[in-house]
Amino acid sequence: MQNKPDFKRELRCLAWGLLAAALAVLACCWTGYDLTDRLSELASYTLINDDYTRYADLTEQGLTQLVPVPAGEPVYGVRLKFDTHNTAYPAGEVQVELLTQAGQSLGAVRRDYRDIIGDVFVAFPLEDAYIPAADETLTVRITATQPWPGVVSLWCSAEEKDGMPLYSGDTAVGATLAVQQITAYAGQWPMRKALQLALPLGLGAFLAAWLLKRRAALPWVTAAVALCLGCAFVQVTPALTAPDEYTHLAVCYEKASRLSAQPTQGQDGKLLLRECDAPYFGTKTGKIGVLAYKQADTARRTQPGSPNVTTVTGAPQAGQSGNGYYAPQVLGILLARALGKNFYTMLAYGRMANLLVYALLAALAVALAPKAAQGILTAAALLPMPLQLAGSLSPDALLIGLVFCYLALCLRLRTHKAAAWELVLLAVLAAVNAPNKAIYLPAVLLCLMIPPQNLLAGTAGKTAVLRGHLWQAGVLGLAAASWCAANLGTALRFFGSHAGLGGAAALLIGAVAAACVLAVLCAFARCRRRNTEKRFWLVFALGVLAAAAAVFAVARRMPVPTPEMMVERLPNGESPYCYTVPYACHYVTVTLKMLVRSAVEQSPLWLQGILGTTLGEPIVYRIDVSWLIGLGLVLALAVAALPVQGSTPLLGRHTAWGVAGTVLCVVCAAVVVSMSWTPLSYTVLFGLQGRYLLPMLPAVLLLAKNAKGIFVPRDTAYPACAAVSTLTLLTILQGFGLYAGWQGAI
């Protein structure tokens, strides 16, 4: 009797999971049906003969046309031009059959009188492509399978074209039909692709509903749902259309070549590739649209791979910079190359490796966090944007997972004395977080939220506080050293080009800044022991203002473009000069107007970038899902951040101000870096995307949860995570429809 309630509860949870899976599969089927209904006739054509001089009548013997096809070019059928001579016949049917040079039938397509009225082009497409391995001549047989009550003609040339004779029965006509080769055709492919998505999306919906209904541990929920929905993103995102994916692919490919002892650079400085990869590498964002989708899928299934030998010179430049954040993608690509997989399979291996590492890091972050913060981290980790990045080759996915882990560990250490493994993990996370993008370097300051007495067990009183502050200073110093080791050369070049500083001056400023940070920490520890924190914050604020004034004064003395230089323009109409710190200090009003205008015009796009409701590379394609999904995600995150009535705040008042300051530092750093590549002719910031601020989203939600406002009687983490998972699933499906429905991509 004791087990019956539990058994019934498990059945209810299982029923919820099955219902969610059924709804997800039904949504996939509807998406496939809708896309097939709208796009099934979409095709692209190559002209074989464009001469429309005379007619060839379709007789009982039929017509036979020979069509040469080059090797490697897909053939989905042909398109012919008919003429019923201004007559709409009540009956009749035409069949077009394609045969290989060896006489093997590739398939036959029939069209009846309803499709052939007047002077009209009629396509006869096959569902799957035939790709000849060598140059080949195909045979096109045209027959009337049902008699026509009148004359039906096809347009042709006055004379026979070279190698393309036309026969009526066995008699040569001495002409060539006006024929177009169908090189791409949508057909029923959208439905097939939607059914492929039904597996990861249905499984993800089942696991989300089942685990959340059972109130399972949120780390397991995060890992399972992130993997399933991320797999769907791997399939939905067209090749090389994720943010900067073509650049990331070149970096990963070169690193994989080095690990496998293959040459990486040709004589012209271009990247060396395998033979099967060379046709697909590029230096720009890939194509989208249902035809591009199907071409990539066909190539993935049919194109052979190559041995892991780089012999062909590609388009990308060799020697592009990269760091350790590419490790998962490099290993995935290396495995695919070792197995001899083709290009698209290799790309999928790299994406899946990136997704796997992100899911593990996201689950680790949720496991490290205190229970009150787990819902926030789970909701943030399951947003469409981090999963889209994880389902591509972007190193930002690894960075997001590491920042989430670092924040979660800092929150964890606020609740108890640190164990040895936690101290080591804190130092490791600070060191590996720092080397990536400079805008995230201020995030290591989050370790200051840890009470210093919690950092070293076995000590008490003033000694514990002092040693704790020293440990925090050591963590910050380790992060700074790690960043300098990875980015010192880049930083010196940046300061030299955008701030007018030489290398020695930049190093001196960095050393002074590090000394100031250490002095501030020591002063804070001393004031805290003497209970004079208010005096410290006053002096600190005055010091910040003085430092800002000094920077402003020094920047005003640095050279900036003259008015004559500022009117110069490149051939594309842009200014050759970008915003710099000295320029901003010289022209404060112009800079402020540009920033305010950017905030007004681009803030919705930044929010979309944080949530992930704009897909792919927004600078190239604007793939925006419904604003209702974005609104739902904002509300779900707000629900996840609601504090429980009677609960203890995660952050103290001073700590909350410190976290807010850290977030502000990251935002300011992102703005300054974006200004450095914004031409002076622009009226808004160029290239600042919302995803740059995504790693700090949980910190913002923590501040909202810490605020005194609306309280709820019980934890809202599970409903919020269910809502985020559902909306992410809908984003994937609508994104698939928008990607497929994009016109003009081929």
At which residue positions do the language-model features occur?
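Short acidic/glycine- and proline-prone juxtamembrane loop motifs at membrane-interface regions
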Residues: S392-L399
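Interfacial juxtamembrane loops and adjacent helix segments
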Residues: L259-Y349
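Membrane-lumen/periplasm interface segments of multi-pass, membrane-embedded glycan/lipid transferases
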Residues: G187-Q188, G458, T463-R467, A473-A541, ...
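Membrane-interface alpha helices of multi-pass inner-membrane proteins
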Residues: E422-A438, A443-M449
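Transmembrane-helix signature of polytopic, membrane-embedded enzymes
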Residues: A216-W220, K341-Y344, A365-P384
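Start-transfer (signal-anchor) and selected internal transmembrane alpha helices
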Residues: M1-W30, W189-C231, W471-Q472, R528-L545, ...
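Transmembrane-helix motifs of polytopic, lipid-linked glycan transferases
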Residues: A348-K371
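Beta-sheet-rich sandwich/jelly-roll-like modules and their strand-loop junctions
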Residues: F7-T100, I116-A134, A144-P200
